[in-house]
Amino acid sequence: LMKNEKLYFTQEIDEDVIDYVRNTPTCQNVVRQGNIIYVTKIPYMAKKYFREKDPKLKRYYYCHCPWVREAIKSDIKISSNFCYCSAGYEKRPWDVIFNQPVKAYVLETVLKGDLVCKFAIHIPEEYSKISRQLKGKRVNKSRLET
């Protein structure tokens, strides 16, 4: 993508963007700790975000939500609860995977002055129990094949 100067989901990609994704395990991937899955959004305007020094503009370039970006730009205070919309977006695939609604929480958000948006997705208890039972056990792959 970088060599061909093509956009990736409307974004220019350069080494700074690649380094960020590579060095932030929760970005574009997930990290599981216990029964919680952590997710960090990738900056919306990544190249501008990485080059920006002003914290306000950095938050502006980070956010995917046009309403929040305009609030940041215009110095309009809105509740960080507004970011539960993004938490809903992040949790939706997990609702499908676990075949039930999961709980999602906003841990960090540009609306609270953070420079990233990070979410916690709670794994349903019955799936946590299964993983605890399997922990340390070998799985016979032939039994998993259909």
Model-derived regions, located:
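Short terminal or interdomain "cap/linker" segment that borders an active site or interface and mediates
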Residues: 48, 81, 100-146
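Disulfide-bonded cysteines in secreted/extracellular proteins and peptides
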Residues: 63-65, 83-86, 117
